[in-house]
C-alpha cells in the first residue's frame, strides 16, 4: 500500500524519522528550512498505522499548499480582522495640509485654504485663508532688521510690543466705557496666553499665543499664533489665526499646525 510522508529539512538533508501525529496540519517553517514529501510503499496493510501515522496524498498536497502560504510574503493589501485593508499597497499620507516653499522659508498650509492677494502688514509675502471664513488665515512677513538674532529683541513679550501692529490697531479714539474687562476708552484688548522659545537648525525662534478681543464681541475674539526668527538681517514672522468660536470647532488643529510648522528653508 502506498503512502506519503513529509520530512522537514534544514540546509543539509537529514535522515527522515517518523513523528507522532501532530494537531496542526501546516508546520511552522523558517526561511532556511525545506519541506519534502516522498511516497513510500508499505510492506503490509496496517489499518491502525494508516489511521495514526500515514498521510494521504491529498493531505500531503494540502500541507504543501499551506506551507507555501506561510512562507509567502504578506502583501500590503492584507489586513487582520477589524482592520482596513490598504488595497493599493501604498502608505497613507496626510491630505489635510500642503507644503509651501517660499523665499527662504517653508511651512504647512491647510489644503482647504486658498491664496489671497490682500496685503495687511509691512513686508507681507504670503496670505492664505479659509475658503469659508476669511478670519481663519495665515500670513508671512519678511522685513529688514539690524538684529542678529530674535533674542536681541528681548523677551517674547518685549518682541511682541515692537510688532504689535500684527494684532491690529484700535481705530476708535473717542470716550467710551466698555464691559468685559476693557479699560476706559479702549475697545480692544490683547491677552498673551503663552510664550516659548526653541532652537531650530541652529537658529532661535519665538512662539507666542495671543487672544485678542474687541468690544463688539465679534467671533468672541481671535486666537493668533506667532512664530518669529531672524536670519541674514531679515525678520521672519508667521502669524496664523482663527476666530474663538471656530477655534473650538476644529480650527485649532489647523492654526497650531500651520504656525508651528514654519521654519527657515
Curated annotation (Swiss-Prot):
Decide whether keyword Membrane is in the record: yes
Q: Which Pfam families match?
A: PsbP
| Coiled coil regions, renumbered to chain | none
- The UniProt annotation puts the transit peptide over 1-79
From the Swiss-Prot or TrEMBL record, state where the protein is found: Plastid, Chloroplast thylakoid membrane
An example Gene Ontology biological process: photosynthesis
Q: Which UniProt keywords apply?
A: Chloroplast, Membrane, Photosynthesis, Photosystem II, Plastid, Thylakoid, Transit peptide
GO cellular component term, pick one: extrinsic component of membrane
A GO term, aspect molecular function: calcium ion binding
Induction info: By light.
The family classification in the record reads: Belongs to the PsbP family.
Give the protein's function. Answer: May be involved in the regulation of photosystem II.
Instruction: Name the chain's protein.
Output: Oxygen-evolving enhancer protein 2-2, chloroplastic
Gene name per UniProt: PSBP2
Amino acid at each position: 500500500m502506498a503512502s506519503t510522508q513529509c520530512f522537514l529539512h534544514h540546509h543539509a538533508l537529514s535522515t527522515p524519522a517518523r513523528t507522532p501525529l501532530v494537531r496542526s496540519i501546516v508546520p511552522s517553517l523558517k526561511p532556511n528550512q525545506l519541506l519534502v514529501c516522498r511516497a513510500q510503499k508499505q510492506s503490509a496493510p496496517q489499518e491502525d498505522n494508516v489511521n495514526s501515522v500515514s498521510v494521504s496524498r491529498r493531505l500531503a498536497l494540502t500541507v504543501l499548499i499551506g506551507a507555501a502560504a506561510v512562507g509567502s510574503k504578506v502583501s500590503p493589501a492584507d489586513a487582520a480582522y477589524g482592520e482596513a485593508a490598504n488595497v493599493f499597497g501604498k502608505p497613507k499620507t496626510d491630505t489635510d495640509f500642503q507644503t509651501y516653499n517660499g523665499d527662504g522659508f517653508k511651512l504647512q498650509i491647510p489644503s482647504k485654504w486658498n491664496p489671497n492677494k490682500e496685503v495687511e502688514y509691512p513686508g507681507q509675502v504670503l496670505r492664505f485663508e479659509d475658503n469659508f471664513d476669511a478670519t481663519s488665515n495665515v500670513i508671512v512677513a519678511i522685513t529688514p532688521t539690524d538684529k542678529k538674532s530674535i533674542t536681541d529683541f528681548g523677551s517674547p513679550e518685549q518682541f511682541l510690543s515692537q510688532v504689535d501692529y500684527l494684532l491690529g490697531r484700535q481705530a476708535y479714539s473717542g470716550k467710551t466705557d466698555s464691559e468685559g474687562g476693557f479699560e476706559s476708552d479702549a475697545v480692544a484688548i490683547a491677552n498673551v496666553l503663552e510664550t516659548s522659545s526653541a532652537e531650530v537648525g541652529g537658529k532661535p525662534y519665538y512662539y507666542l499665543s495671543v487672544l485678542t478681543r474687541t468690544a463688539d464681541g465679534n467671533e468672541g475674539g481671535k486666537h493668533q499664533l506667532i512664530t518669529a526668527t531672524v536670519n541674514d538681517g531679515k525678520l521672519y514672522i508667521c502669524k496664523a489665526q482663527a476666530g474663538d468660536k471656530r477655534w473650538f470647532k476644529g480650527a485649532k488643529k489647523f492654526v497650531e499646525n500651520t504656525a508651528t510648522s514654519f521654519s527657515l528653508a
